[in-house]
UniProtKB/Swiss-Prot annotation:
Hydrolyzes ribosome-free peptidyl-tRNAs (with 1 or more amino acids incorporated), which drop off the ribosome during protein synthesis, or as a result of ribosome stalling. Catalyzes the release of premature peptidyl moieties from peptidyl-tRNA molecules trapped in stalled 50S ribosomal subunits, and thus maintains levels of free tRNAs and 50S ribosomes. Its EC number is 3.1.1.29. This is Peptidyl-tRNA hydrolase. TRNA binds at residues 14, 64, 66, 112. Belongs to the PTH family. Residues 202-225 are annotated as: Disordered. The record marks 9 as: Discriminates between blocked and unblocked aminoacyl-tRNA. The gene is pth.
Length: 238
């Protein structure tokens, strides 16, 4: 069993906020045919269903962002799950809008929802980070995350949310590389590939130097006619 928790703030006034992109992603998953209507339990809106043959509990904590861990932790303990069974979907300031990353564990990076999950669930859960971009000025961050997405953002936001739902089985099974490729394809961004390792080449030699090296015998003959001739030429004595 897996818990997929979208992070956000409850209430109509926050519904369109950038900070609520985690809720939006879980809403997209809940629209899959296998999921039940939303109900309330564990201080959250929940919906049970299946993805790729595995039982999944979708959660939207009603505790507000900075107490999200209370809700998710309660469900984790109820079902006797571990942090490895939890997938948190959240907004990420440090990624360009529409870019995505996924990882296990790590720091909370100042995100209050993750900070709460760390405290109540442990740190070794998977995090699907959805980029909302940075406003460029620290003073504008609060207004940016609690501001609504612009109409122009729908160009990448809607395809991203659809792609998360369409490729939900990859999310649940941990096929992270394939999932990142699918999400990048949907938003028109390029997934970052590992940079090839540069192999050091031997220092280039001039053609003359190469010819000298190849023409020069590795060892001079010690006996025979050639040896006698060399002795006479260079005055080498026994």
């Amino acid at each position: 069993m897996k818990i997929i928790a979208g992070l956000g703030n409850p209430g109509a006034q926050y519904a369109g906020n950038r900070h609520n992109i985690g809720f939006m992603a879980v809403d997209a998953l809940q629209r899959l045919p296998s999921f039940a209507p939303w109900s309330k339990k564990f201080k959250a809106e929940i919906s049970e269903g299946e993805i790729g043959g595995e039982k999944v509990l979708l959660m939207k904590p009603l505790t507000y962002m900075n107490l999200s861990g209370e809700s998710v932790g309660e469900a984790m303990r109820f079902f006797k799950l571990t942090p490895a069974d939890i997938i948190a979907i959240h907004d990420e300031l440090d990624l360009l809008a529409g870019r995505t990353r996924i990882k296990i564990g790590g720091g909370h990076g100042g995100h209050n929802g993750l900070k709460s999950l760390d405290a109540h669930c442990g740190k070794e859960y998977r995090r699907l980070r959805l980029g909302i971009g940075h406003p460029g000025d620290k003073e504008r961050v609060h207004g940016h995350v609690l501001g609504d997405f612009a109409k122009s953002d729908r160009v990448w936001l809607d395809p991203l949310l659809d792609a998360i739902a369409d490729n939900a089985a990859m999310l649940v099974k941990g096929d992270d590389s394939q999932l990142m490729n699918k999400l990048a394809l949907a938003t028109g961004s390029k997934p970052e590939a590992e940079k090839p390792v540069k192999v050091a080449k031997p220092a280039a030699q001039s053609h003359i130097h190469q010819a000298r090296n190849s023409a020069q015998p590795k060892k001079l003959p010690e006996t025979g006619p050639m040896a006698e001739m060399l002795k006479r030429m260079f005055g080498k004595k026994d």
